[in-house]
């Protein structure tokens, strides 16, 4: 395990903080400092109204006291599933530092102002394809889609956010921190919402 990870290690499990989000930010910062290849890559699982699951990778845009922020098209599979069933679960796995965090809870879209701000913070070069693409719809003509995106990007200026491009917040009901141990007594610490606060428990590996 790297130096940055070690500095945030054992004491956290022996004496947990009162809430998990500050610890999650610290672990994410440590992953970045230790050159984890994609520290913000979240494996996000959703399910439809019948409970049939699907999973994909999304990018965590921010860790707030209220949850994890990411963006997606409302017409994508995850967008449709979240509209039917708000519960989701995501895993941040950092192989390089032998850690993972699992965050589970209700997930829904934020307001237009926040979505606009996130959209405008993205590189302008990402705008044309995000505007042209109807995410998860069948691709019938790849060249036509590429040409549409090229034309949209000809001006090299920011494009308006598509109505379907939304900011989502995963509001945790539970957060579990896991850290590998050579003796297989891997360290696990789970936080669960308890009224207005949090309860924490050490778990067996």
Task: State what each model feature region is.
Residues 1-205:
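Binding-site signature for planar aromatic cofactors or substrates
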């Amino acid at each position: 395990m790297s130096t940055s990870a070690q500095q945030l290690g054992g004491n956290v499990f022996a004496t947990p903080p009162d809430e998990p989000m500050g610890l999650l930010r610290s672990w994410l910062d440590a992953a970045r400092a230790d050159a984890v290849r994609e520290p913000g890559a979240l494996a996000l699982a959703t399910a439809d109204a019948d409970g049939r699951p699907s999973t994909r990778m999304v990018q965590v845009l921010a860790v707030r006291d209220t949850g994890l922020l990411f963006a997606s098209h409302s017409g994508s599979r995850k967008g449709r599933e979240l509209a039917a069933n708000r519960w989701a679960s995501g895993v941040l796995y950092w192989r390089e530092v032998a850690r993972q965090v699992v965050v589970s809870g209700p997930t829904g879209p934020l307001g237009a102002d926040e979505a606009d701000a996130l959209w405008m913070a993205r590189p302008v070069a990402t705008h044309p394809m995000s505007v042209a693409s109807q995410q998860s719809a069948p691709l019938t003509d790849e060249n036509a889609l590429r040409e549409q995106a090229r034309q949209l990007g000809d001006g090299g200026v920011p494009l308006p956010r598509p109505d379907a491009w939304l900011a989502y917040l995963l509001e945790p009901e539970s957060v579990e921190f896991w850290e590998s141990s050579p003796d297989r007594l891997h360290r696990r610490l789970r936080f669960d919402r308890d009224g207005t606060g949090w309860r924490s428990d050490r778990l067996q590996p």
